[in-house]
Amino acid sequence: MQQTLMRSFLCALALATAITPAVQAASHAQPATMRLDYQHSGNALGEHYAVERVLVEPLPWPGSMARTLDDSNRGVNMVEVVDIKSGKVLYSRGFSTIFGEWSSTDEAKTTTRAFQESVRFPQPEQPVRVRILKRDERGLFSIVWSTDVDPKAQDVIRQQPPASVKPIPIRVSGASADKVDLLILGDGYTAAEMGSFEATARKLADHLFTVSPFRERADDFNVWAMAAPTQESGVSRPSTGVHHASPLGTRYDIFGSERYVLTTDNRALRDLAQYAPYEFIEILVNNDTYGGGGIFGQFSTAAANNDWANYLFVHEFGHHFAGLADEYYTSPVAYQSNGERQEPWEPNATALRDPAKLKWKSHVKAGTPLPTPWPKEAYDSHAREYQKERAARRAQNRPESEMSALFKADLAHTEQLFSKAPQRHAVGAFEGANYESTGFYRPEMQCIMFDRSETFCSVCQDGISTIIDLYAGTPKR
């Protein structure tokens, strides 16, 4: 009993210390958190940016001031915060965007759209230039937009309204500055369902830390949970005529994909999240239907009540947290390929232009053929039939239990097929990845990023560990 009381006291103390709701709590060591909200608009041919507002969030900067520069080389974009007077880069982080994905869809060829975006950084003492960079066709970053931010300017919003909800400490391992802070948000939960949300958040967080390398690095994480109640249970699924006004605006059918779940209401997301310490966000949608999504450096989503919620939570977090590529290629997606096979920036996919320079070559045993043979023809044949059946069942709006049974049977078939393959557990270069049947290669035959299996391949594990180190590792000198 005394141990239980002591744990409760320590959690409460850590919570009070970590989320003191006042900018005054910031110090020289931990400055305030500054946020630049902006509009990112355009189409398949071009893009534009425009400032919406600059504000100071209620909580101090959650990250380490000793690890402010990103050397991971991840993301389609990168933000740099530069001291105007000296030209010194004070802060940088790679990220990707919903606009970046949308711009490769058919709609972007005929329509111009705007998306809300934000970048957060430690509040500087002097005026800074915020630069947004984008990868070019060579994979190198170049500046596409910049704007000057004066932290002392009169139009900086310095006072936020009182928090409508408070974060729940799920896992507190230490001070936020020394840890990765993951915030689990709920969307589509009524006031009566808040207990269910907390229980699900705890269950899924616990599951995340059973999967390597999160299991071995669990002490490097803090996890918080928070949800604003809604009047109706669930989020929108337009393809079935279901529309709900959920607080975060999360919905299915993004880009016309029935399983793709995102929110495009960035302001609603950030205005709620700012009341908890966070660097990463996963949104649990209060729905049974299979679905999720993940954008590197933005957020990820998962259907909380689906039979595959554990898998969805981890798979989508892999996208958001580490910028891992999807390794599957048989499921339909809205993105349009331009036919080119440029080297992906993601750590777990390659165009294999030069096998001698394979980016995960250190994982490959001597004598492993590159490309690496696997039963691709048999896999593809089954996948075509499976995708037809899946599409037919979705068109008929069959019960989710039937869909889950289909997914389970598909995974069992894959496991049985792969069990006979000589390179079953090898690290190599297996053709078929990044939504393409040919021209892109994945590190191992099977991985959480390829199908609904339970483990990350060794290359993905390394990619995840790199990001953990960026936020919670020993600072480089």
Regions found by a protein language model. Give the residues of each.
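Bacterial N-terminal signal peptides
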Residues: 8-20
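Active-site-proximal segments of metallohydrolase catalytic domains
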Residues: 220-296
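Extended acidic/polar, glycine-enriched regions
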Residues: 109-176
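Fold-level signature of zinc-dependent metallopeptidase catalytic domains
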Residues: 154-215, 225-235
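N-terminal prosegments of processed precursors
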Residues: 26-116
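Catalytic Zn2+-binding segment of zinc metalloproteases
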Residues: 317-333
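Short pre-active-site segment immediately N-terminal to the catalytic Zn-binding motif
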Residues: 196, 293-316
